[in-house]
Structure formats: structure tokens, C-alpha cells
């Protein structure tokens, strides 16, 4: 069974690139573009990993991580934060489900390694 990854990102070009790269690596990938949509999508899709942008319409990445951490089932899903802001790393440092941080623009080779580590494929 393929492992499922949910991309929560509002930039269409980033979503398309991430989906292409991750599907080539053999993952099942879905995406959503707003924070409000994200929470229901996580509950419905049950991803093995979430790639989460910090700046989102409706609900930001920090709010989504708080919702996840407050839920017994969802709190165990690993998260990789994606952001163009280096300062975002400090914001998420205290959340155990945040496994890594990937700075935009992406270095795809590094992103794939981080995904595989977070999802347990390395």
C-alpha cells in the first residue's frame, strides 16, 4: 500500500511541483489550499505525512499544528513545515509532530530525503 501525503499549500505552482516529485517517488498525494479545508481533509484522508505551508488563507500553519496536537489521533501524524521565512522554524520548535522544516524555494533532493525520514522510508 502506498503511503499517503497531504500537501497543504496555497501556491498552485508549489503544489504541482511537490505532487509530481512525490508521486514519482511512489507516494499517494493529495492537496488542499486553505487552512479551513485542511483540517477536514486530514480527518478524511488520514495521511502518513503532512507538508504544511505556514501562510495560508483561512487558518495559518501554526493554528493547524495546534489543532493536530490537541487531537489524540491526528497528533501522531508527522508534519514537515514549508516556508520562505527562516523565522518560522522557531515558531514550530515545541511541537513534537513537526519533524522537519523545508525552506522555499525547495531543493528537491533535500525535500525527498526529509519526506522519507519523516515517513519512515529511510
Where do the protein language model's features map onto the residues?
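Charged docking surfaces used in two-component/phosphorelay signaling
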Residues: 16-24
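Conserved acidic carboxylate
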Residues: 9
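The feature encodes the CheY-like receiver
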Residues: 57, 75
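Short hydrophobic/Thr-rich beta-strand motif most characteristic of the beta2 strand and flanking loop
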Residues: 26-33, 41
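C-terminal output helix
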Residues: 106-116
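Active-site residues of response regulator receiver
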Residues: 53
Amino acid at each position: 500500500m502506498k503511503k499517503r501525503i497531504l500537501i497543504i499549500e496555497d501556491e498552485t505552482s508549489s503544489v504541482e511541483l511537490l505532487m509530481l516529485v512525490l508521486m514519482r517517488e511512489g507516494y499517494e498525494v493529495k492537496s488542499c489550499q486553505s487552512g479551513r479545508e485542511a483540517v477536514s481533509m486530514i480527518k478524511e484522508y488520514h495521511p502518513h505525512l503532512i507538508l504544511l505551508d505556514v501562510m495560508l488563507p483561512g487558518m495559518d500553519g501554526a493554528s493547524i499544528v495546534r489543532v493536530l496536537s490537541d487531537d489524540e489521533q491526528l497528533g501522531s501524524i508527522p508534519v514537515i513545515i514549508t516556508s520562505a521565512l527562516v523565522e518560522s522554524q522557531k515558531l514550530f520548535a515545541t511541537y513534537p509532530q513537526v519533524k522537519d522544516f523545508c525552506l522555499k524555494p525547495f531543493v528537491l533532493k533535500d525535500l525527498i530525503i526529509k519526506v522519507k525520514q519523516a515517513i519512515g522510508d529511510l
